Amino acid sequence: MINPIVKTIELGDGRTITLETGKLAKQADGSVMLRMGNTMLLATVCAAKDAVPGTDFMPLQVEYKEKFAAFGRFPGGFTKREGRASDYEILTCRLVDRALRPLFPDNYHAEVYVNIILFSADGVDMPDALAGLAASAALAVSDIPFNGPISEVRVARIDGKFVINPTFDQLEQADMDIMVAATYENIMMVEGEMSEVSEAELLEAMKVAHEAIKVHCKAQMELTEMVGKTVKREYCHEENDEELRKAVHDACYDKSYAIAASGNRNKHERQDAFDAIRDEFKAQFSEEELEEKGALIDRYYHDVEKEAMRRCILDEGKRLDGRKTTEIRPIWCEVGYLPGPHGSAIFTRGETQSLTSVTLGTKLDEKIIDDVLAHGKERFLLHYNFPPFSTGEAKAQRGVGRREIGHGNLAHRALKRMIPEDYPYVVRVVSDILESNGSSSMATVCAGTLALMDAGVKIKKPVSGIAMGLIKNAGEEKYAVLSDILGDEDHLGDMDFKVTGTKDGITATQMDIKVDGLSYEILERALNQAKEGRMHILGKIEETISEPRTELKDHAPRIETMTIPKEFIGAVIGPGGKIIQGMQEETGATITIEEIDNVGRIEISGTNKKSIDDAIRLIKGIVAVPEVGEVYKGKVRSIMPYGAFVEFLPGKDGLLHISEIDWKRLETVEEAGIKEGDEIEVKLIDIDPKTGKFKLSRKVLLPRPEKK
């Protein structure tokens, strides 16, 4: 009989979360089944016993997978089986990875695999907000070294009140949606979108989230005690030579500090200078000695380089490229650079450059979303590409990676609330990073704003973005908040805090922290300093283009929308789509129709106004209600001995009796010169109340001859 160990977390709103271990996946180093309502996630962790020789980083791999069976659904596609990870699953992986990675010991290099699987879902509670807790709990019941526990929660603001882990329905009403990860003591990661909130409101949301996370962390500590996994495995993944470490520091620190303080703005020249110092030190050793000590020298020199850069900033306020801590790199922008797309822009900030294009599409271009729990259509798309040449790397470009999906998602969230809800076009923004030295996702936001305005998209307000950094040594009061960080400042610093927004508030944020003990005072200073930087960048954007263009590019599609009564939808489509397809062939316009809120919504698009006007005329003809006494221009469809049948509205034929053709008596219709295909004006004089047949007259429109 299996006796699983269960820990229950009581939430403030009456809901509960249970963490169960010892029942499933017992051969993993740690496994926990998390349950909230009918949502169940299994998290497992496995770690190699030893590190791969030569590994000097943390080889952590996080996988998140949603089973379609969890929600009682079949996967799509020919194989009817789960395939490669969706963007949503990749983004959830990244949320968990970014929270866990900083908390493994610096000298722990064994491969660690975290797998989180959604086995049951009810469509009410959101599983991505629970994945971090499940993963941390699995680590907590394992013997893998980890300086946790952590947890993640989603906090949303609905009608002015903060809600922890809202339901799908609640989130639709929120004006703030952020994910926060933290240990019991410190916030580690933040990511989310919002409707132009203030810095103080964002900080308040983070504090509310942290209080909820503390409850989760305490429960995991108690679960660890219950399982008896308080002692972690021993490991030795790094061998050190303290004499060599001291020799590297003594020989290289002053030279490295001089490079760090030189203010060279060219990152390749600067790195070459740093590398030359290391190579000079290595030159004193033989090839045999370097085989033994070369990797250690590289690691120790990296520490020297890091210390020199950090001390230069803290002690002198000098950054690697010579800027002050609050200074933004030089910016230049250009719009309309590419003639082919419907809008384009170049945004260059220092050595980071984005070339962004905008394409306007119709309803047929909507992205269909068919994930396990998310269904619908996306009308605003943003794609981010980061080719190797942007950093001068000589390597092949593979498919879209997790990083590109994550950076694109952040820029998408920064801009999407600025697109009017009733905007008729489907919009695709593509950012190609051509140069990169930090903050490329923020360059995408700025270039995206410029390109959207160049395309004539009526965005509500321009958006700018900035990446902030932090230098803070443990045990020191002194710290430095850096505006518009370089790639090296991101790598060697303690924080990467990206903030985007308009002149009136923040629209999106993403923060990763690598140090303990980061106070809310420091976060507040970083947010306020970010606001100053955002306003400066926004000014540069508005100098280039101050508002959206009033006219679309000549080759952009034109779109008109109209609504019709629900009962006419079938008439517009026709049997097997015959009518709507015929109208498209006749006019050259693209016509789509759907039922929304009990009415038919029609979208007509084309490359010229005439095709759209012709399509509108035909549709109006179909949905028009024939009125007795109205005059119509009709087409003679057939000739009979007793008269002619005339199509006076699309799909509506009436009888023009021979006696109604002319005032004089006719023996045949042809006597009046009427033949099939002729267009003639007729008046609707009657509708048979029983059969609904239409009676037409031509003679009432002709002058009546005087009686002799």
Curated annotation (Swiss-Prot):
Main location: cytoplasm
GO cellular component, one term: cytosol
Magnesium in keyword set: yes
S1 motif domain mapped to chain residues: 629-699
Record field: catalytic activity: RNA(n+1) + phosphate = RNA(n) + a ribonucleoside 5'-diphosphate
Keywords attached to this entry: Cytoplasm, Magnesium, Metal-binding, Nucleotidyltransferase, RNA-binding, Transferase
GO biological process, one term: RNA processing
GO molecular function: 3'-5'-RNA exonuclease activity; magnesium ion binding; polyribonucleotide nucleotidyltransferase activity; RNA binding
PROSITE patterns associated with the record: KH_TYPE_1, S1
Source superkingdom: Bacteria
Cofactor(s) needed by this chain: Mg(2+)
E.C. designation(s): 2.7.7.8
The family this protein is said to belong to: Belongs to the polyribonucleotide nucleotidyltransferase family.
PANTHER family in the record: POLYRIBONUCLEOTIDE NUCLEOTIDYLTRANSFERASE (PTHR11252), POLYRIBONUCLEOTIDE NUCLEOTIDYLTRANSFERASE 1, MITOCHONDRIAL (PTHR11252:SF0)
Function of the molecule: Involved in mRNA degradation. Catalyzes the phosphorolysis of single-stranded polyribonucleotides processively in the 3'- to 5'-direction.
Protein name stated in the entry: Polyribonucleotide nucleotidyltransferase
Species this chain originates from: Bacteroides fragilis (strain ATCC 25285 / DSM 2151 / CCUG 4856 / JCM 11019 / LMG 10263 / NCTC 9343 / Onslow / VPI 2553 / EN-2)
Organism classification: Bacteria, Pseudomonadati, Bacteroidota, Bacteroidia, Bacteroidales
